[in-house]
Protein backbone atom coordinates (compact mmCIF):
# COMPACT_ATOMS: atom_id res chain seq x y z
CA UNK A 1 0.00 0.00 0.00
CA UNK A 2 2.80 2.40 0.74
CA UNK A 3 4.29 1.91 -2.72
CA UNK A 4 0.97 2.52 -4.42
CA UNK A 5 0.33 5.66 -2.39
CA UNK A 6 3.79 7.04 -3.13
CA UNK A 7 3.38 6.34 -6.84
CA UNK A 8 -0.01 8.08 -6.90
CA UNK A 9 1.43 11.12 -5.13
CA UNK A 10 4.33 11.30 -7.57
CA UNK A 11 1.94 11.11 -10.52
CA UNK A 12 -0.25 13.86 -9.07
CA UNK A 13 2.78 16.09 -8.56
CA UNK A 14 3.93 15.47 -12.12
CA UNK A 15 0.50 16.25 -13.51
CA UNK A 16 0.33 19.51 -11.57
CA UNK A 17 3.80 20.49 -12.71
CA UNK A 18 2.91 19.80 -16.35
CA UNK A 19 -0.30 21.75 -16.08
CA UNK A 20 1.55 24.74 -14.67
CA UNK A 21 4.04 24.59 -17.50
CA UNK A 22 1.26 24.42 -20.07
CA UNK A 23 -0.47 27.42 -18.50
CA UNK A 24 2.73 29.45 -18.68
CA UNK A 25 3.28 28.51 -22.32
CA UNK A 26 -0.34 29.33 -23.05
CA UNK A 27 -0.01 32.76 -21.46
CA UNK A 28 3.12 33.52 -23.43
CA UNK A 29 1.79 32.51 -26.83
CA UNK A 30 -1.92 33.11 -26.41
CA UNK A 31 -4.01 34.25 -29.39
CA UNK A 32 -7.50 35.86 -29.18
CA UNK A 33 -9.01 33.37 -31.65
CA UNK A 34 -7.76 30.27 -29.81
CA UNK A 35 -8.43 31.44 -26.25
CA UNK A 36 -11.46 29.18 -25.83
CA UNK A 37 -9.67 26.10 -26.97
CA UNK A 38 -6.72 26.72 -24.60
CA UNK A 39 -8.98 27.09 -21.61
CA UNK A 40 -10.29 23.60 -22.08
CA UNK A 41 -7.03 22.00 -23.14
CA UNK A 42 -4.80 22.48 -20.02
CA UNK A 43 -7.39 20.78 -17.83
CA UNK A 44 -7.76 17.79 -20.12
CA UNK A 45 -4.14 17.39 -21.26
CA UNK A 46 -2.51 15.91 -18.12
CA UNK A 47 -5.03 13.07 -17.89
CA UNK A 48 -3.91 11.22 -21.04
CA UNK A 49 -0.23 11.61 -19.96
CA UNK A 50 -1.02 9.99 -16.64
CA UNK A 51 -2.89 7.20 -18.41
CA UNK A 52 0.00 6.77 -20.83
CA UNK A 53 2.49 6.50 -17.96
CA UNK A 54 0.49 4.09 -15.81
CA UNK A 55 -2.84 3.04 -17.33
CA UNK A 56 -3.79 0.91 -14.33
CA UNK A 57 -3.61 3.79 -11.86
CA UNK A 58 -5.35 6.33 -14.12
CA UNK A 59 -8.95 7.32 -13.34
CA UNK A 60 -11.74 5.80 -15.43
CA UNK A 61 -13.52 9.06 -16.41
CA UNK A 62 -10.27 10.75 -17.33
CA UNK A 63 -9.26 8.17 -19.93
CA UNK A 64 -12.32 8.56 -22.23
CA UNK A 65 -12.37 12.33 -21.89
CA UNK A 66 -8.70 12.61 -22.87
CA UNK A 67 -8.77 11.45 -26.49
CA UNK A 68 -12.23 12.99 -27.23
CA UNK A 69 -11.06 16.63 -27.48
CA UNK A 70 -8.14 15.57 -29.64
CA UNK A 71 -10.51 13.85 -32.05
CA UNK A 72 -13.31 16.40 -32.19
CA UNK A 73 -11.22 19.54 -31.68
CA UNK A 74 -8.35 19.61 -34.19
CA UNK A 75 -7.64 23.22 -33.22
CA UNK A 76 -6.06 22.03 -29.97
CA UNK A 77 -3.06 20.73 -31.92
CA UNK A 78 -2.46 24.07 -33.65
CA UNK A 79 -1.18 26.14 -30.69
CA UNK A 80 1.46 23.55 -29.80
CA UNK A 81 3.52 23.88 -33.01
CA UNK A 82 3.22 27.66 -33.05
CA UNK A 83 5.44 28.23 -30.02
CA UNK A 84 7.89 25.79 -31.59
CA UNK A 85 7.87 27.79 -34.80
CA UNK A 86 8.36 30.99 -32.84
CA UNK A 87 11.31 29.45 -31.02
CA UNK A 88 12.75 28.28 -34.32
CA UNK A 89 12.32 31.73 -35.77
CA UNK A 90 14.18 33.29 -32.85
CA UNK A 91 17.08 30.86 -33.10
CA UNK A 92 17.90 31.60 -36.78
CA UNK A 93 17.66 35.30 -36.04
CA UNK A 94 20.23 35.02 -33.34
CA UNK A 95 22.41 32.84 -35.56
CA UNK A 96 22.08 35.36 -38.38
CA UNK A 97 23.03 38.18 -36.07
CA UNK A 98 26.14 36.29 -35.11
CA UNK A 99 26.95 35.31 -38.69
CA UNK A 100 26.40 38.69 -40.31
CA UNK A 101 29.37 40.67 -38.87
CA UNK A 102 31.86 37.94 -39.79
CA UNK A 103 31.53 38.22 -43.60
CA UNK A 104 31.40 41.99 -43.32
CA UNK A 105 34.65 42.08 -41.44
CA UNK A 106 36.26 39.69 -43.91
CA UNK A 107 35.05 41.72 -46.86
CA UNK A 108 36.39 44.96 -45.44
CA UNK A 109 39.70 43.25 -44.69
CA UNK A 110 39.94 41.97 -48.28
CA UNK A 111 38.87 45.27 -49.74
CA UNK A 112 41.36 47.46 -47.86
CA UNK A 113 44.52 45.36 -48.05
CA UNK A 114 45.00 44.73 -51.81
CA UNK A 115 44.44 48.23 -53.27
CA UNK A 116 47.48 49.72 -51.47
CA UNK A 117 50.09 47.62 -53.32
CA UNK A 118 48.05 47.73 -56.55
CA UNK A 119 48.33 51.50 -56.70
CA UNK A 120 52.10 51.37 -56.21
CA UNK A 121 53.26 49.04 -59.00
CA UNK A 122 51.68 47.20 -61.96
CA UNK A 123 48.14 48.51 -61.59
CA UNK A 124 46.81 47.19 -64.93
CA UNK A 125 47.72 43.50 -64.75
CA UNK A 126 46.82 43.25 -61.09
CA UNK A 127 43.42 44.85 -61.65
CA UNK A 128 42.76 42.26 -64.31
CA UNK A 129 43.90 39.49 -62.01
CA UNK A 130 42.05 40.80 -58.95
CA UNK A 131 38.76 38.95 -59.64
CA UNK A 132 40.73 35.75 -60.09
CA UNK A 133 41.94 33.55 -57.23
CA UNK A 134 45.72 34.09 -57.58
CA UNK A 135 46.02 37.80 -56.80
CA UNK A 136 48.26 36.93 -53.82
CA UNK A 137 51.56 36.06 -55.53
CA UNK A 138 51.73 39.29 -57.56
CA UNK A 139 51.15 41.18 -54.32
CA UNK A 140 54.06 39.38 -52.70
CA UNK A 141 56.13 39.98 -55.79
CA UNK A 142 55.30 43.67 -55.55
CA UNK A 143 56.28 43.74 -51.89
CA UNK A 144 59.53 41.95 -52.64
CA UNK A 145 60.17 44.36 -55.48
CA UNK A 146 59.67 47.20 -53.02
CA UNK A 147 61.80 45.61 -50.27
CA UNK A 148 65.02 44.82 -52.20
CA UNK A 149 66.09 48.45 -52.71
CA UNK A 150 66.27 49.17 -48.94
CA UNK A 151 67.94 45.78 -48.44
CA UNK A 152 70.50 46.54 -51.10
CA UNK A 153 71.64 49.62 -49.20
CA UNK A 154 73.37 47.72 -46.38
CA UNK A 155 74.46 44.89 -48.71
CA UNK A 156 77.26 46.89 -50.40
CA UNK A 157 79.03 46.88 -47.01
CA UNK A 158 79.47 43.10 -47.14
CA UNK A 159 81.38 42.86 -50.44
CA UNK A 160 83.66 45.79 -49.64
CA UNK A 161 85.55 44.29 -46.64
CA UNK A 162 86.41 41.01 -48.41
CA UNK A 163 87.73 43.14 -51.27
CA UNK A 164 91.01 43.84 -49.44
CA UNK A 165 92.92 45.07 -52.53
CA UNK A 166 90.59 48.09 -52.79
CA UNK A 167 91.75 50.24 -49.83
CA UNK A 168 90.11 53.42 -51.10
CA UNK A 169 86.62 52.96 -49.53
CA UNK A 170 88.03 51.68 -46.21
CA UNK A 171 89.73 54.89 -45.00
CA UNK A 172 86.57 56.86 -45.64
CA UNK A 173 84.61 54.42 -43.55
CA UNK A 174 87.26 54.50 -40.86
CA UNK A 175 87.11 58.27 -40.74
CA UNK A 176 83.33 58.23 -40.52
CA UNK A 177 83.42 55.57 -37.83
CA UNK A 178 86.11 57.26 -35.74
CA UNK A 179 84.04 60.42 -35.74
CA UNK A 180 80.96 58.60 -34.45
CA UNK A 181 82.37 55.60 -32.62
CA UNK A 182 81.08 56.72 -29.25
CA UNK A 183 77.60 57.25 -30.67
CA UNK A 184 77.43 53.71 -32.04
CA UNK A 185 75.74 51.04 -29.99
CA UNK A 186 77.38 47.82 -28.88
CA UNK A 187 75.58 45.80 -31.55
CA UNK A 188 76.78 48.14 -34.30
CA UNK A 189 80.33 48.00 -32.98
CA UNK A 190 80.20 44.22 -32.98
CA UNK A 191 78.94 44.21 -36.54
CA UNK A 192 81.82 46.43 -37.62
CA UNK A 193 84.32 44.23 -35.79
CA UNK A 194 82.88 41.12 -37.41
CA UNK A 195 83.24 42.73 -40.82
CA UNK A 196 86.91 43.40 -40.05
CA UNK A 197 87.52 39.94 -38.61
CA UNK A 198 88.25 41.14 -35.09
CA UNK A 199 87.03 39.49 -31.89
CA UNK A 200 83.65 40.72 -30.73
CA UNK A 201 83.68 39.83 -27.03
CA UNK A 202 84.27 42.48 -24.39
CA UNK A 203 82.81 45.70 -23.07
CA UNK A 204 82.03 48.76 -25.12
CA UNK A 205 85.32 50.42 -24.16
CA UNK A 206 87.25 47.38 -25.39
CA UNK A 207 85.26 47.37 -28.61
CA UNK A 208 86.01 51.06 -29.14
CA UNK A 209 89.72 50.42 -28.61
CA UNK A 210 89.65 47.62 -31.16
CA UNK A 211 87.82 49.83 -33.63
CA UNK A 212 90.29 52.68 -33.20
CA UNK A 213 93.34 50.46 -33.54
CA UNK A 214 94.58 50.34 -37.16
CA UNK A 215 96.22 46.91 -37.11
CA UNK A 216 95.27 44.51 -39.92
CA UNK A 217 92.50 42.10 -39.00
CA UNK A 218 94.47 38.89 -39.60
CA UNK A 219 97.54 39.78 -37.53
CA UNK A 220 95.70 40.72 -34.37
CA UNK A 221 94.06 37.44 -33.43
CA UNK A 222 97.32 35.54 -34.09
CA UNK A 223 99.31 37.87 -31.87
CA UNK A 224 96.68 37.60 -29.18
CA UNK A 225 96.67 33.84 -29.39
CA UNK A 226 100.45 33.76 -29.08
CA UNK A 227 100.31 36.13 -26.14
CA UNK A 228 97.63 34.05 -24.51
CA UNK A 229 99.54 30.83 -25.22
CA UNK A 230 102.77 32.30 -23.86
CA UNK A 231 101.30 34.24 -20.99
CA UNK A 232 98.48 31.97 -19.90
CA UNK A 233 100.56 29.39 -18.01
CA UNK A 234 102.47 32.02 -16.03
CA UNK A 235 99.48 33.64 -14.30
CA UNK A 236 98.09 30.18 -13.74
CA UNK A 237 101.26 29.00 -11.99
CA UNK A 238 101.87 32.20 -10.10
CA UNK A 239 98.83 32.00 -7.87
CA UNK A 240 99.66 28.38 -7.16
CA UNK A 241 103.21 29.36 -6.17
CA UNK A 242 101.85 32.16 -4.06
CA UNK A 243 99.37 29.80 -2.46
CA UNK A 244 102.17 27.32 -1.76
CA UNK A 245 104.30 30.07 -0.26
CA UNK A 246 101.39 31.23 1.85
CA UNK A 247 100.71 27.70 2.99
CA UNK A 248 104.40 27.27 3.88
CA UNK A 249 104.28 30.52 5.82
CA UNK A 250 101.17 29.34 7.58
CA UNK A 251 102.88 26.05 8.42
CA UNK A 252 105.87 27.96 9.68
CA UNK A 253 103.72 30.26 11.72
CA UNK A 254 101.48 27.54 13.09
CA UNK A 255 104.13 26.04 15.38
CA UNK A 256 104.90 29.51 16.65
CA UNK A 257 101.24 30.01 17.38
CA UNK A 258 101.21 26.78 19.37
CA UNK A 259 104.63 27.39 20.94
CA UNK A 260 103.70 30.20 23.38
CA UNK A 261 102.85 27.76 26.20
CA UNK A 262 106.42 26.44 26.58
CA UNK A 263 108.11 29.84 27.10
CA UNK A 264 105.37 30.75 29.50
CA UNK A 265 106.13 27.53 31.33
CA UNK A 266 109.77 28.60 31.48
CA UNK A 267 108.60 31.90 32.86
CA UNK A 268 106.68 30.08 35.55
CA UNK A 269 109.93 28.33 36.48
CA UNK A 270 111.57 31.73 36.85
CA UNK A 271 108.75 33.09 38.98
CA UNK A 272 108.32 29.93 41.04
CA UNK A 273 110.29 31.43 43.95
CA UNK A 274 107.65 34.11 44.55
CA UNK A 275 104.59 32.08 43.62
CA UNK A 276 102.49 29.29 45.05
CA UNK A 277 103.50 25.64 44.47
CA UNK A 278 100.52 25.07 42.13
CA UNK A 279 102.15 26.45 38.93
CA UNK A 280 105.25 24.32 39.56
CA UNK A 281 103.21 21.17 39.00
CA UNK A 282 101.79 22.64 35.85
CA UNK A 283 105.26 23.39 34.54
CA UNK A 284 106.26 19.79 35.12
CA UNK A 285 103.33 18.70 32.95
CA UNK A 286 104.23 20.95 30.01
CA UNK A 287 107.34 19.67 28.15
CA UNK A 288 109.77 22.40 27.10
CA UNK A 289 111.19 21.90 23.58
CA UNK A 290 114.88 22.46 22.97
CA UNK A 291 114.73 25.15 20.23
CA UNK A 292 112.81 27.55 22.45
CA UNK A 293 115.23 30.29 23.61
CA UNK A 294 115.55 30.42 27.40
CA UNK A 295 115.34 34.01 28.68
CA UNK A 296 118.47 35.32 30.36
CA UNK A 297 118.75 36.38 33.98
CA UNK A 298 118.54 40.11 33.25
CA UNK A 299 115.18 39.92 31.49
CA UNK A 300 113.95 37.65 34.26
CA UNK A 301 114.73 40.24 36.90
CA UNK A 302 113.12 42.97 34.82
CA UNK A 303 110.09 40.75 34.30
CA UNK A 304 109.81 40.25 38.05
CA UNK A 305 109.94 43.95 38.72
CA UNK A 306 107.40 44.67 35.99
CA UNK A 307 105.08 42.01 37.34
CA UNK A 308 105.31 43.55 40.77
CA UNK A 309 104.57 46.95 39.25
CA UNK A 310 101.60 45.51 37.46
CA UNK A 311 100.34 43.98 40.69
CA UNK A 312 100.76 47.32 42.44
CA UNK A 313 98.81 48.96 39.63
CA UNK A 314 96.04 46.41 40.04
CA UNK A 315 96.08 46.97 43.80
CA UNK A 316 95.82 50.72 43.35
CA UNK A 317 93.11 50.35 40.74
CA UNK A 318 91.10 48.23 43.15
CA UNK A 319 91.31 50.55 46.13
CA UNK A 320 87.53 50.78 46.01
CA UNK A 321 85.70 48.91 48.78
CA UNK A 322 85.96 45.43 47.24
CA UNK A 323 86.32 42.05 48.80
CA UNK A 324 89.44 40.05 49.55
CA UNK A 325 92.11 42.14 47.80
CA UNK A 326 94.67 41.61 50.58
CA UNK A 327 94.00 37.88 50.58
CA UNK A 328 94.85 37.71 46.91
CA UNK A 329 98.18 39.48 47.35
CA UNK A 330 99.29 37.78 50.58
CA UNK A 331 101.69 35.41 48.87
CA UNK A 332 103.24 38.16 46.77
CA UNK A 333 106.65 39.40 47.99
CA UNK A 334 106.64 43.17 48.23
CA UNK A 335 109.70 44.81 46.68
CA UNK A 336 112.19 46.49 48.96
CA UNK A 337 112.56 49.57 46.77
CA UNK A 338 109.25 50.07 44.95
CA UNK A 339 109.36 51.98 41.72
CA UNK A 340 107.09 54.96 41.01
CA UNK A 341 103.52 54.04 40.32
CA UNK A 342 102.58 53.04 36.82
CA UNK A 343 100.04 55.41 35.31
CA UNK A 344 96.60 53.83 35.22
CA UNK A 345 95.66 55.36 31.89
CA UNK A 346 95.86 52.19 29.86
CA UNK A 347 95.51 52.61 26.12
CA UNK A 348 92.79 49.98 26.04
CA UNK A 349 89.51 50.12 27.86
CA UNK A 350 89.11 48.48 31.28
CA UNK A 351 86.17 46.51 29.91
CA UNK A 352 88.69 43.99 28.60
CA UNK A 353 89.14 42.70 32.14
CA UNK A 354 85.40 42.29 32.61
CA UNK A 355 83.73 39.00 31.58
CA UNK A 356 82.66 40.37 28.22
CA UNK A 357 83.19 38.77 24.81
CA UNK A 358 86.22 41.04 24.43
CA UNK A 359 87.88 39.41 27.43
CA UNK A 360 88.60 36.31 25.39
CA UNK A 361 91.69 38.00 23.99
CA UNK A 362 92.96 38.75 27.49
CA UNK A 363 92.23 35.23 28.67
CA UNK A 364 94.23 33.93 25.74
CA UNK A 365 97.26 35.88 26.95
CA UNK A 366 97.46 33.74 30.06
CA UNK A 367 99.44 30.57 29.59
CA UNK A 368 97.31 27.80 28.14
CA UNK A 369 99.24 25.20 30.18
CA UNK A 370 98.01 26.75 33.41
CA UNK A 371 94.50 25.88 34.66
CA UNK A 372 92.62 29.14 34.29
CA UNK A 373 89.85 29.63 36.85
CA UNK A 374 87.30 30.57 34.22
CA UNK A 375 86.48 28.31 31.31
CA UNK A 376 88.26 30.44 28.74
CA UNK A 377 87.84 29.39 25.10
CA UNK A 378 90.65 28.52 22.76
CA UNK A 379 93.18 31.34 22.44
CA UNK A 380 91.76 33.61 19.77
CA UNK A 381 94.18 35.28 17.35
CA UNK A 382 92.42 38.61 17.76
CA UNK A 383 92.74 40.46 21.04
CA UNK A 384 93.21 43.90 22.54
CA UNK A 385 96.50 44.47 20.76
CA UNK A 386 96.92 48.04 21.98
CA UNK A 387 96.84 47.07 25.65
CA UNK A 388 99.06 44.04 25.12
CA UNK A 389 101.52 45.98 22.98
CA UNK A 390 101.76 48.56 25.74
CA UNK A 391 102.52 45.83 28.27
CA UNK A 392 105.05 44.19 25.94
CA UNK A 393 106.73 47.55 25.44
CA UNK A 394 107.09 47.87 29.21
CA UNK A 395 108.64 44.41 29.41
CA UNK A 396 111.09 45.25 26.61
CA UNK A 397 109.96 42.34 24.44
CA UNK A 398 108.86 42.54 20.80
CA UNK A 399 105.29 43.47 19.92
CA UNK A 400 102.74 40.76 19.34
CA UNK A 401 102.84 39.04 15.95
CA UNK A 402 106.54 39.78 15.28
CA UNK A 403 109.15 37.03 15.63
CA UNK A 404 109.09 34.40 18.35
CA UNK A 405 106.76 35.19 21.21
CA UNK A 406 108.46 36.71 24.22
CA UNK A 407 107.62 35.55 27.73
CA UNK A 408 104.38 37.09 28.88
CA UNK A 409 104.29 39.66 31.67
CA UNK A 410 101.51 37.95 33.53
CA UNK A 411 102.95 35.79 36.28
CA UNK A 412 101.64 32.44 37.35
CA UNK A 413 100.47 33.97 40.63
CA UNK A 414 97.20 34.98 39.00
CA UNK A 415 96.34 31.32 38.45
CA UNK A 416 96.86 30.11 42.01
CA UNK A 417 94.14 28.75 44.26
CA UNK A 418 93.18 32.21 45.45
CA UNK A 419 93.05 33.60 41.91
CA UNK A 420 89.34 32.90 41.60
CA UNK A 421 88.67 35.79 43.92
CA UNK A 422 90.52 38.09 41.55
CA UNK A 423 88.29 37.00 38.68
CA UNK A 424 85.24 37.52 40.88
CA UNK A 425 86.42 41.02 41.61
CA UNK A 426 87.04 41.75 37.97
CA UNK A 427 83.38 41.11 37.26
CA UNK A 428 82.44 44.29 39.12
CA UNK A 429 82.13 47.41 36.94
CA UNK A 430 85.14 49.69 36.98
UniProtKB/Swiss-Prot annotation:
Lineage: Eukaryota, Metazoa, Chordata, Craniata, Vertebrata
Name of the protein in question: MEF2-activating motif and SAP domain-containing transcriptional regulator
Skewed-composition ranges (Low complexity): 363-373, 393-403
SMART domains associated with the record: SAP
Gene3D superfamilies documented for this protein: SAP domain
PROSITE patterns: SAP
Entry keywords, A to Z: Activator, Nucleus, Transcription, Transcription regulation
Residue ranges annotated for the SAP domain, each copy included: 181-215
A GO-annotated cellular component: nucleus
UniProt feature, compositional bias: Pro residues: 147-170
Quaternary context: Interacts with MEF2C.
Main localization of the protein described in the UniProt heading: nucleus
UniProt cross-references to InterPro entries, sorted A to Z: SAP_dom, SAP_dom_sf, TransReg_TumorExp
Organism: Bos taurus
Amino acid sequence: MTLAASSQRSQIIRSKFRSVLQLRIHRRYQDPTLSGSFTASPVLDPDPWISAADPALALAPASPLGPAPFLFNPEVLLPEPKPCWSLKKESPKTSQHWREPKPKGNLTYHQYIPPEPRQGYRADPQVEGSPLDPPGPPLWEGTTSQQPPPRMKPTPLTPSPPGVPSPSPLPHKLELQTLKLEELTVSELRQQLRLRGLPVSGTKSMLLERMRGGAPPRERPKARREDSAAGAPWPRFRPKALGAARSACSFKLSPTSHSPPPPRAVETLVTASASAPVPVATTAQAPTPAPVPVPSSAPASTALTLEEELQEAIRRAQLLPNRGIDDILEDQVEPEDPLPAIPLDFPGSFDMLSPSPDSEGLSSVFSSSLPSPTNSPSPSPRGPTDFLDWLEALSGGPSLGCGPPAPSIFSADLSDSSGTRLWDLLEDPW
